[in-house]
Swiss-Prot record:
Gene name linked to the record: pyrD
Topology in membrane: Peripheral membrane protein
Keyword Flavoprotein: yes
Pathway field: Pyrimidine metabolism; UMP biosynthesis via de novo pathway; orotate from (S)-dihydroorotate (quinone route): step 1/1
Compartmental location: Cell membrane
Protein name (Swiss-Prot/TrEMBL): Dihydroorotate dehydrogenase (quinone)
GO cellular component, one term: plasma membrane
Source species taxonomy: Bacteria, Pseudomonadati, Pseudomonadota, Gammaproteobacteria, Enterobacterales
GO molecular function: dihydroorotate dehydrogenase (quinone) activity; dihydroorotate dehydrogenase activity
Residues of the active site: 175 (nucleophile)
Organism from which the protein derives: Salmonella typhimurium (strain LT2 / SGSC1412 / ATCC 700720)
E.C. numbers: 1.3.5.2
Main location: membrane
Family, similarity comment: Belongs to the dihydroorotate dehydrogenase family. Type 2 subfamily.
Amino acid sequence: MYYPFVRKALFQLDPERAHEFTFQQLRRITGTPLEALVRQKVPTKPVTCMGLTFKNPLGLAAGLDKDGECIDALGAMGFGSLEIGTVTPRPQPGNDKPRLFRLVDAEGLINRMGFNNLGVDNLVENVKKAHFDGILGINIGKNKDTPVENGKDDYLICMEKVYAYAGYIAINISSPNTPGLRTLQYGDALDDLLTAIKNKQNDLQAIHHKYVPVAVKIAPDLCEEELIQVADSLLRHNIDGVIATNTTLDRSLVQGMKNCQQTGGLSGRPLQLKSTEIIRRLSQELKGQLPIIGVGGIDSVIAAREKIAAGATLVQIYSGFIFKGPPLIKEIVTHI
């Protein structure tokens, strides 16, 4: 496969520049016959999760296609689902550059992007043009300048705008790069948010005559007590699924490596065991009452199987996709 050569060229560039260049090319081919250049035939292995039928258990994690610009091209590579976003009510530039760093030896990434996106209205227009035949998840967040105490308003605005177009909606309360965001994972703040989201979901179901499931994306840095509390809240509020996990602030496995001290969330192989352990504990707490979408450091068939053995129904990739390319999709779907 050509990807090792492509990767070598891309890794000569600054990580964000490499991402922009890649997306520039994908935008050119998305929705055109040139999509055949990236199309891969993968086996159909249907999985039911959150009341939806996924054509295979592998999805693209949020953060790669923040604005839904390359849905068809990414879909052609064989993903059973794509999670686009994180998107916010209003466009925002994100944090200052540089804000994305490779840890090449560890096959990890550190990012402090800060929800850079062109806003929810732009994303919806892109979704309307797409023809992806898999499940499309839309990941939503709050604007940086929205006070945390008003954060739920941003989630409700986004829900209202994406509901008609989403296969499922992911609630991102676990990015480490928006000040105060992770506080929404705890106690009364989480209960208030989930109550508002569930009420909005019920209202939107009545308006649109369809039920769009909602999943909450959590951090890997929860202590035991916090994990138990989160699991309890998700069950009490009848949330449809949980995505575990986002990036970590823990640097214990990358000490001494180039870029290891950069501020931001660490993803990729160094996150693998930590996220799998969270999935295992979460699975014990949830007792099969709520499905888990497993994400964090999946870079091989074995790593994907470990997530499923720990309790995940579906899995997602991001950093592994950057390091291994489209062949990883075919490999995982074929052998999982």
